Amino acid sequence: MNNKPTIGIILGDPSGIGPELVSKLLTDKITDKANCILIGERSILEDGEKTSGVKTNLIPAKNFEEVDFSKGSKFFIDITNGKNRTYEKKIANAESGASVLESLDYALDLAKEKKIHAINFGPMNKTSLILGGCKYNDEHDFMQEKLGIKEFCCEFNVVDNFWTARVTSHIPIKDVAQNITAENILKPIKLIHKTLLMSGMKNPRVAVQALNPHGEFGTEEKDEIIPAIEEAKKMGINAGGPLPCDTSFITAFKNKEYDCIIGMYHDALQCGLKAFGFDRGVTVSGGLSVPVTTPAHGTAFDITEKNIANMEPTINSFQIALNMSERLANSTS
């Protein structure tokens, strides 16, 4: 067997653009840098190949025990054992959600058994996941529970190797301030620092946003945010701020003064990040025992089967999985 990391790949929601993007990914030279195992259904793969006009030529395997990387570096495990399922296109539905959950569950089992070093998946649809039986808010919560992770986890968004994380996420604005505590702020600071080191960045510079306009007109900066930054510095983390939200992306991202930024609430980060590069973005599930990456965009039902979806986020998401898994593979070999 070669020394390349092993990455489990999932096609994403079969009703959206995931299968066509992943089919193209598997024919891109970037995937030659890893051992790849596509986990899914043959009918979905064939749909993706047909739309994208490529042939992946993956080596079939009934299960992981049949995977032999001395024979090649790209395998396909059909979790249906040859069943020919069909899925309605361009709409959220239970069948598609259940298919994604089945593939993801299989990949997570391989990760728990340390048979793969990372997971990279095509875009999923949260509505389909819930219709398909997911009992959690999204795939991130599902993965955390499946892997038995009790520690803090959060979602990272990445554009041009600039990373973001949030103290609060999908909660009402009226509830944000009460959740801004030094303890809660320190958690994503520590996690993003650790994750960036794992991705190969040395001494990452961590910016922390303010909560209030211009970092004034409130006490959260003085009472909670600054103490969290100071505590991070004591831990050896190169943290700075608080930066006013309205100019934070100019300072940190455009002027390249920081490598990542921590925001206090969802839109304080997402508006800036998406304005600067949503078409290139990647989502990383932070805090899990295995790197998990995906394009930041959704299933794009409106352009499904048109073969016009931008490949860049898919390539970028695989590259991050590759960077992180190389270090994980080396540490366990």
Feature locations, PLM:
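Short, flexible loop segments at boundaries between secondary-structure elements
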Residues: 146-162, 286-302
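Ligand-binding beta-strand-loop-alpha-helix segment within the catalytic cores
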Residues: 68, 157-179, 183-186
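Glycine/threonine-rich beta-strand-loop-alpha-helix active-site module
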Residues: 131-154
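Short, well-ordered, mixed-charge alpha-helical segments that flank or form enzyme active sites
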Residues: 127-131, 151-154, 163-165, 173-175, ...
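Contiguous, glycine/small-aliphatic-enriched amphipathic segments in soluble metabolic enzymes
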Residues: 1-139, 182-264, 268-281, 288-293, ...
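Beta-strand scaffold of nucleotide-dependent catalytic cores
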Residues: 154-156, 167, 272-274
